[in-house]
């Protein structure tokens, strides 16, 4: 009888832990996506007027964007509408994102995948258009490894277990 109760408790604990971990991960993913989206929106609105669709290496925003990238733990890229990389805070040397089509992901403000083959693993990616005189001139792209998001969710979940 006691063995049955112990087995039931262990199974219940396992099920609850698994479900809570998944819910916590989804919540963390959504929370970080919202934060990244707001950051991308801020970058696009703050520096959109200075952005002319050309070379942004001389733009005063480059050092600031690198600082934001380090602070948020996200890679920040400015892409032209055709996918040409205008600026990349990771200094990857990438010229363009092949097959870039922002219309492909209109259902959500974030995506979790390899972002048009750019990454070797899944990344949480948020993009926001840079507009100037009512025309889309490019896109602000923020990307963060899903492994980092999972780590943040696990740290939060572990903290909840301790308390």
Language model: regions and residue ranges:
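Extracytoplasmic/periplasmic sensor domains and loops in membrane signaling proteins
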Residues: 59-62, 84-121
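Acidic surface patches and DE-rich sequence motifs
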Residues: 80, 117-118, 132
């Amino acid at each position: 009888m006691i063995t049955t109760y112990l087995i039931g408790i262990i199974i219940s604990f396992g099920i609850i832990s698994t479900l809570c971990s998944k819910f916590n991960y989804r919540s963390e993913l959504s929370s970080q996506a919202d934060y990244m989206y707001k950051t991308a929106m801020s970058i696009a609105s703050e520096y959109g007027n200075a952005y002319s669709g050309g070379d942004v290496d001389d733009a005063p925003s480059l050092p600031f964007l690198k600082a934001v990238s380090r602070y948020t733990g996200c890679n920040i890229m400015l892409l032209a509408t055709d996918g040409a990389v205008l600026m990349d805070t990771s200094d990857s040397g990438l010229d363009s994102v092949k097959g870039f089509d922002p219309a492909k992901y209109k259902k959500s403000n974030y995506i979790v995948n390899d972002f048009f083959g750019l990454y070797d693993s899944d990344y949480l990616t948020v993009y926001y258009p840079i507009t100037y005189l009512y025309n889309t001139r490019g896109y602000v792209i923020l990307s963060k490894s899903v492994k980092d998001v999972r780590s943040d969710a696990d740290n939060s979940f572990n903290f909840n277990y301790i308390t």
